[in-house]
Amino acid sequence: RYGSSAASDVYKRQIIDIELLVEKELGEFAIQICDPQRIGTFIPTHSPFKRWEFEIHDDDDIDEFSSDENIKKLLSPWLNPDEYKILRKAIYQFHSVLANEFQKDNCYLIGDAAHQNPPFMGEGMMTGCRDAENLSWKIIMDHKYNLGESLLKNYQIERRDHARFIVENSLGIGLLMEAYAHTENIEDVPAE
């Protein structure tokens, strides 16, 4: 029942993730597309593969939105349909959630059970791996040397602040992208 101790989910967005086979050179930099009509991301994974993500609006019909015809429209500013092959498409929901407690008695939360964040820092999976690494050696040492709870109690102290940093900053980057996409004057976007 740890879910009930989680902080509120202040950032919920759906995106479509589209993986393509593209022979055309598109550069080696990830690009955030701050288009007021539809925010998106371009990620140049290992050649010849490319990844595009586009925000799904609340009033979009998911089936229609994820159709190949609509994907062609989404990609049309950058690619012609004969320049790519769609390999995969998936709908994801991004969250910004941080559990208030990562441990209680002998129950521990790691990874997505403890924290979820938008992907804008690219740290979601690695934050979960750091949780697992931090907790696993403590459990092994406790089991091997019967150290009691003292070592295991440090898990919350050592991991929650780091996870909070990732969640809050990922959220901040997402909100900043939205602010840039929806402003007429860049100087109107707050510095923080």
Kindly label every feature range from the protein language model:
Residues 1, 71, 135-136:
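Structural preference for long, well-ordered alpha-helical segments in enzyme cores
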Residues 4, 22, 26, 59-62, ...:
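Short, polar/flexible loop-turn hinges at active-site or ligand-entry regions and domain interfaces
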Residues 1-11:
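Single conserved hydrophobic/aromatic residue that forms the stacking wall/gate
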Residues 8, 30-33, 99:
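Short Gly/Pro-enriched turn/cap motifs at secondary-structure boundaries
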Residues 14-41:
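Flavin-dependent oxidoreductases
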Residues 186-192:
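Long, low-complexity segments enriched in small/aliphatic residues
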Residues 35-91, 188:
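Conserved FAD/dinucleotide-binding core of flavoprotein oxidoreductases
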Residues 86, 92-172, 179:
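Conserved mid-domain beta->alpha element of the FAD-binding
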